Amino acid sequence: MNKPSIAALLLFSLISISGMNKVQAQNLQLYYDAGRGCATSTVEMFRPDAGGSTFFFIDFDYSPKVSGAYWEIARELNFWQDSKVNWLSVHLEYNGGLNVGTAFNNAFLGGLTYSGHSKDFTKTWSLSAMYKAIPGTFDASGKCQMHNFQITGVWGIEFAKGWCTFSGFADFWREHRTWQGTEFIFMTEPQFWVNLNKVKGWENIHLSVGGELELSANFVAKGFHAMPAAGAKWTF
């Protein structure tokens, strides 16, 4: 599964906080995941409003039939967009899914997000600290361990006069996985995109090509893993 372009969510959230609350975005991403040997599609939607913003994404894995599904929906609450603390928002999130033979535990998150940006919005960043409830999680002794935490950092950088975008996220969270004897998980997915709407005559072609590199510890399996994926993204 691919994590969404949360950096895009951050960018649009910051724009909406700055008063441009009519901004909204949807995109479709297609990847070939060389590490897993499968294809992945991702649909994302972002929409701001007077009280904050809503974002969701849905992933499907294909190998070649649908072999997995995963989704997240997040709400940023910010009723104080005109105040001096509009950089702070309340974050609420749900995620869950399944693949062949098993299902991911439902996860419910809540916490605070700090967001920042450069004057021209070509550089954006955020840091979220969240409580994470994962019902049905137990440690090796059989004790329920549903109460956990997650820290998420997000960045987005647009450069080369808008031709290129470097974005991504880094997650660190606690989740007991008795089958592999681990308790903490780290994952980051830096993405690089070339934006083809900068080609002369292609201004209305909202296509980007590039990909991502998933780096994780104790996520796919115990230990460190690197999984590159080539992709294309259409924004509409």
What annotation goes with each model-predicted range?
Residues 1-25:
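Cleavable N-terminal export/targeting peptides
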Residues 22-64:
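Short glycine/proline- and aromatic-enriched beta-strand/turn motifs that initiate or cap beta-hairpins
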Residues 22-24, 51-53, 78-90, 117-126, ...:
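Short loop/turn motifs that connect adjacent beta-strands in outer-membrane beta-barrel proteins
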Residues 30-36, 60-64, 92-98, 129-135, ...:
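Transmembrane beta-strands of outer-membrane beta-barrel pores
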Residues 43, 71-73, 110-112, 151-155, ...:
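Membrane-embedded beta-strands of outer-membrane beta-barrel proteins
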Residues 132-208, 214-218, 234-236:
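Outer-membrane beta-barrel transmembrane domain signature
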Residues 224-236:
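Outer-membrane beta-barrel "beta-signal"
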